[in-house]
Amino acid sequence: MEWTKVTVATVNEAVEAIANILTEAGAEGIQIEDASINDTLVGDVAAVSAFFPETVFVPEKLPLIRQRVLQLTEFGLSIGEGSVNLQQVADDDWATAWKKYYQPTRLTRFLTVVPSWTDYQPTDEREALIRMDPGMAFGTGTHPTTHLSVQMLEMVLRGGEQLIDVGTGSGVLSIAAAHLGVQDIRAYDVDQVAVDAAVANFDLNPVTQGIIAKPNDLLHGITGAADVIVANMLPVVLVPLIPQVPALLKEGGHLLLAGIITEKEAVIRETLSANGLMVEESLHMGDWVGLITRLKTDED
């Protein structure tokens, strides 16, 4: 069987958004390369490759893929070169070659993302493993925004909480939360493919038993308050999400936001303030920002 490989030349800032575009176009596998794993790429340059089966006529989809990649600039994302190229590859070429680029990655002192096919063992008795299958697309769980999200979870969780994961994608944040002692986790994503990918990853991690994963558009129609709501999404999605949060956030609870590029931080802060939320702490990694927020009180 032959596959069609579509590669988008871009920068790190846009890799997850482009991966989602390619997945929605019908890709069955995603490969992300940057300077840390490919020495032909320099600085912030990255490449996102997607693999389409023979049943998908890719040339017909290319114009829309190119259009959607270019539209990312309207959301404040830099896409770098933004070129889109395709080539034919044999089944064996992509089915194994991409795995060498995906290695165990320490997200925090105690949480490590591990490819599902490795026999990696914890180096510390306190180290917990998040096993992931990036063949499901929706990222490998190693993007800076994921690092920020998991760091924020470690900062606010004490165990026993109720948590809502909005835009769960690969499910990595729900898995991390389960490792950190959260008792009740609800994971939502507007895309059924993402929900299926998350459930597949949950199955790789016994600690996630009991997580509820369903398709849903942000928090529309959701009932039942939570101690923590976490969302790692682009600002264009976070802005309409924020007004939905106060009704579902328990007193003393936290809203954790990631996926925010530095230039959009002010817009997010303004939206938070307008909806009765305030920033308690901010974290930074490169051009990305993570915000730990809570409901305002009479004392604020």
Curated annotation (Swiss-Prot):
Quote the record's binding site residues for S-adenosyl-L-methionine: 146, 167, 189, 232
Q: Name one GO cellular component term.
A: cytoplasm
Q: Which NCBIfam families match?
A: prmA
Q: What does this protein do?
A: Methylates ribosomal protein L11.
Gene3D superfamilies found in the cross-reference section: Vaccinia Virus protein VP39
**Record localization:** Cytoplasm
Cite the source lineage: Bacteria, Bacillati, Bacillota, Bacilli, Lactobacillales
Family named by the database record: Belongs to the methyltransferase superfamily. PrmA family.
Sorted alphabetically, the Gene Ontology BP terms of this entry are: methylation
Task: Spell out the molecular function terms from Gene Ontology.
Answer: protein-lysine N-methyltransferase activity
- The kind of enzyme this is, by top-level EC class, is transferase
- Protein name (database record): Ribosomal protein L11 methyltransferase
Q: Which reaction does it catalyse?
A: L-lysyl-[protein] + 3 S-adenosyl-L-methionine = N(6),N(6),N(6)-trimethyl-L-lysyl-[protein] + 3 S-adenosyl-L-homocysteine + 3 H(+)
Enzyme Commission no: 2.1.1.-
Q: Does the keyword Transferase apply?
A: yes
Q: Which UniProt keywords apply?
A: Cytoplasm, Methyltransferase, S-adenosyl-L-methionine, Transferase
